């Protein structure tokens, strides 16, 4: 454990950010899995709506630096192919 006051604060902030980032990533993954589940059940109407939500969450995660922008683009592209197939 850190002894210096500023190091204690940084450790606390780091833990808070880690928890927040984990929450956002989990929400993002859930949205992607929802789209994939709807596509596999041939519910394309709801899949298109879920794709919009998942796309927004992927973009936001990329903007915040949680995932790389190219990774977000790649995931969105693959989801779009599945939804439009």
Swiss-Prot record:
Pfam families: Ribosomal_S20p. It comes from the Bacteria. Keywords: Ribonucleoprotein, Ribosomal protein, RNA-binding, rRNA-binding. Residues 1-22 are annotated as: Disordered. InterPro entries: Ribosomal_bS20, Ribosomal_bS20_sf. GO terms for molecular function: small ribosomal subunit rRNA binding; structural constituent of ribosome. GO terms for cellular component: cytosol; small ribosomal subunit. Disulfide bonds: none annotated. The keyword RNA-binding applies. GO terms for biological process: translation. The keyword Zinc does not apply. Belongs to the bacterial ribosomal protein bS20 family. PANTHER family: 30S RIBOSOMAL PROTEIN S20, SMALL RIBOSOMAL SUBUNIT PROTEIN BS20C. Binds directly to 16S ribosomal RNA. This is Small ribosomal subunit protein bS20. It comes from Bacillus cytotoxicus (strain DSM 22905 / CIP 110041 / 391-98 / NVH 391-98).
